[in-house]
Amino acid sequence: MASHQEQSYKAGETRGKAQEKTGEAMGTMGDKTQAAKDKTQETAQSAQQKAHETAQSAKDKTSQAAQTTQERAQESKDKTGSYMSETGEAIKNKAHDAAEYTKETAEAGKEKTSGILGQTGEQVKQMAMGATDAVKHTLGLRTDEGNKEHVSSAPSTTTTTTTRETQRK
């Protein structure tokens, strides 16, 4: 039985050593964990401080830039106001002249267009009458001697189109 006691003793001893090593490892891990927590907290606090400083600096710069912009805008407004009062009448006159020119050009175009449309309408009318006469003649519904009332009395016209080639340099 001594051997059984000896085994029991050795098992207890091994168990005690294992518990001691586990305790040491847990202590070491706890220390490392605490150190990591402390380091993380320091880093976060430092980053927060840096962000606050950066934000304050940006705020100051923005405020200063806004003030400068406002001053320059006021100066520009003053300069523009005097320039506009000097040139306002000239601009008004140029606008009036441009409107007058546009009106005259539109009237000339209207007159020219109405003449062309009148001629075109007459030509279309004559072409339709000619086509009607040709169909009647083809179908035998018309003879020049028997149906003089259906013969077109409109003068025949010939249209010539001239095209010019424009050469660009």
From Swiss-Prot:
It is found in: Cytoplasm, Cytosol. It comes from the Eukaryota. GO terms for cellular component: cytosol. Expressed in sepals, petals, pistils and stamens. Its main location: cytoplasm. Belongs to the LEA type 4 family. Involved in dehydration and freezing tolerance. Protects and stabilizes the enzyme activities of ADP-glucose-pyrophosphorylase (AGPase) and glucose-6-phosphate dehydrogenase (G6PDH) during drought stress and freezing. Prevents aggregation of leaf soluble proteins during drought stress. Does not stabilize liposomes during drying and rehydration. This is Late embryogenesis abundant protein 7.
